[in-house]
């Protein structure tokens, strides 16, 4: 009887992990390819302001760089960590994307960067919660 109960919990955890990975992937693919309308579908209501902020800081030079890019940004989902019952952190690696790291200056194509996304449970859905724009985790450790 105990084995069945443990197996049931593992399945629930596995299902949650899968859902969280899907949400993080959908958000990151949209966000790092500058499809903010699509990214908006995968974030909490209070995160919308950060997507709007990012969208209003794109210059014509950035648009030209995005249009000249030969391939879309790619995202690899890494480790999922539980913070509490309703909050998780998802590590992602993003490749070949336009990095905007200084306001008022054009972005540049970045080969690879690592980010952590916070995913929260709201009702029956999991959504990305942005407290700020995503920050490159590698850069902060240099």
Predicted regions and their residues:
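Short solvent-exposed beta->alpha transition segments
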Residues: 21, 36-98
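Intrinsically disordered, low-complexity segments enriched in polar/charged residues with Gly/Pro
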Residues: 16-17, 64-68, 103-107
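Short, low-complexity N-terminal intrinsically disordered segments enriched in polar/charged residues
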Residues: 7-33, 41
